[in-house]
């Protein structure tokens, strides 16, 4: 999409009445129209949210009540991980913990507990994850771009969307 087009898009969203909530919980469970009384028909969430909606639904649903849009330039890959800390005092225990986190059992369970895709190849997807197709392309800036431009992007986004 490019930097300028992204900020133009956000400016148009502001003119269209975009609301920025305090956090994900408020956006999803209060403002989103799927929630009781919410007025916003769209919410920024995770690609796995439709699968979680189906998994936790009280009704017997065969399809999720929400969908996921994988728009060009609008998918940011969120990475969560576990690693050794330089100078850590319990390296053997930390290595065992990492091994545990990478185990097939944990990788399978994380899919319907944390709604994450497995990191280890060969781990089968949970049935619910068929409703959470992994986005084909994420437009994640490089670490260097984030280091060089991140603060300016946040300041500009705040000015464009919130001020």
Predicted regions and their residues:
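Extracytoplasmic/periplasmic, Sec-exported soluble proteins
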Residues: 20, 24, 76, 85-90, ...
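Short coil/loop linkers at secondary-structure junctions
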Residues: 4, 19, 116-117, 132, ...
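Internal helical hairpin/lid segments
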Residues: 46, 64-95
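Sec-exported extracytoplasmic/periplasmic mature domains
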Residues: 14-18, 33-37, 55, 89, ...
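Ligand-binding pocket segment of bilobal, Venus flytrap-like solute-binding proteins
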Residues: 2-74
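Mature extracytoplasmic/periplasmic domains
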Residues: 80-141
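Extracytoplasmic/secreted proteins, especially bacterial periplasmic and envelope-associated proteins
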Residues: 5-8, 23, 27, 31, ...
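Extracellular/periplasmic bilobal clamshell ligand-binding domains
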Residues: 127-163
């Amino acid at each position: 999409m490019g930097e300028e087009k992204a900020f133009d898009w956000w400016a148009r969203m502001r003119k269209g009445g975009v609301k920025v909530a305090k956090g994900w919980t408020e956006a999803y469970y209060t403002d989103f129209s799927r929630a009781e009384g919410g007025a916003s028909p769209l919410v920024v969430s995770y690609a796995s949210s439709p699968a979680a909606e189906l998994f936790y639904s009280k009704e017997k649903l065969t399809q999720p009540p929400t969908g996921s849009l994988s728009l060009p330039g609008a998918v940011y890959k969120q990475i969560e991980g576990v690693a050794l800390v330089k100078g850590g005092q319990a390296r053997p225990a930390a290595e065992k913990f990492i091994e545990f986190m990478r185990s097939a059992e944990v990788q399978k369970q994380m899919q319907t507990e944390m709604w994450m895709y497995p990191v280890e190849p060969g781990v089968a997807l949970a049935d619910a994850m068929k409703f959470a197709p992994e986005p084909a392309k994420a437009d994640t800036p490089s670490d260097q771009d984030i280091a060089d431009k991140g603060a300016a992007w946040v300041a500009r986004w705040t000015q464009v969307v919130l001020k």
